[in-house]
Amino acid sequence: MALLHHTQNAAQIKLRYRISSSAKPASCQANSFGTPTGLHQIADCIGATAPAGMVFKGRRATGRLASEYPLNEQASNLITSRILRLRGLELAHNAGQGCDSFERYIYIHGTNHEDRIGQPFSGGCIEMFNFDIIALFEIAQLGDLVYIFN
């Protein structure tokens, strides 16, 4: 994933991040578990004061770090550290009935499986190293644009 600085005449890559996207093929369809493609915007920024590794359920901090969960729960893909919730901006592609990224709860977030970053592993979200999502969260703003390529 690359963070671009866009000017009127050009775009320049400012930062690069290794990520994990869906284990399934890219897809904007509801219930596909694929990472949606196309133009999105950041619709919500969640977890500003949470410590690295904090687990979120239903977009709320649980009060427990991933390492504090029983091993059987750690085996699942936990949402950790920060959440940037995405809203699709392309009607009938990633916005609207049957394909809406916001309604699918598509996020950019930290993970308890950092060893799998760089491999397709998620259930549709974009997962990052916890340190990286915290750094990205510090510079991201509501309304910032995100373009997801296949």
Positions of the model-derived regions?
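A structural motif detector for short, solvent-exposed N-terminal "entry" segments of globular domains
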Residues: M1-P25
